[in-house]
Amino acid sequence: VWCVAAVLNRHAHFRYGRDEAGRIGIWDELHPYYTVPRRDAPDLFAMKVTRFTPDYDAFLSRFREDYARAETCGRLLCDETLPPNVCGISAMPGLAFSAFSFGGDPKPDFTPFVLLGKVHPAGDRTVLPVGGEFAHAVNDGGHISGFFKELEETAAKLFPD
């Protein structure tokens, strides 16, 4: 979650959004809004926001507290109110996918939505599938491929072999 948010926050083209009046602008930062499996109903999940900080250790401490709260909140939305500047991160921990397609209506905002799959071994490596939905109005192929490349580099620095 931190790696995704860190990469998105490094680049203005991933932080486009709309204010309450519908005006387009660039957020100073995005906070990850992510899914957490619920303890009371393992087939359901809860959604939680953790305020982003570029300091990994500080973020991890907040994330662990927020995650524990979300596991036991007993409902879909753990936060009473959400900041407008969030980036969605969801997980499908039971699926080791190689491709994924989002369907439905386009999102009304411009922030990316990132999907994480099942961590699994692949030869001598451990793989975490990652997919994403990006608004073509503000992100083109170069931005998107750059996101995935930088995400891989960020994770490799944080979790060296």
Predicted regions and their residues:
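Acyl/amide activation-and-transfer machinery of modular secondary-metabolite enzymes
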Residues: 1, 28-54, 127-133
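Residues in well-ordered beta-strands of folded domains
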Residues: 17, 33-37, 48, 64, ...
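Active-site-proximal acidic secondary-structure segment that organizes catalysis
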Residues: 10-12, 57, 69, 108-161
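Flexible, Gly/Pro-enriched loop and linker segments at secondary-structure and domain junctions
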Residues: 83-127
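Hydrophobic "lid/gating" helix adjacent to the active-site nucleophile
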Residues: 1-32
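Short, conserved, surface-exposed binding loops centered on an aromatic residue
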Residues: 24-26, 36, 78-81, 106
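Helical lid/core segments from catalytic subdomains that handle acyl or acyl-like groups
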Residues: 38-97
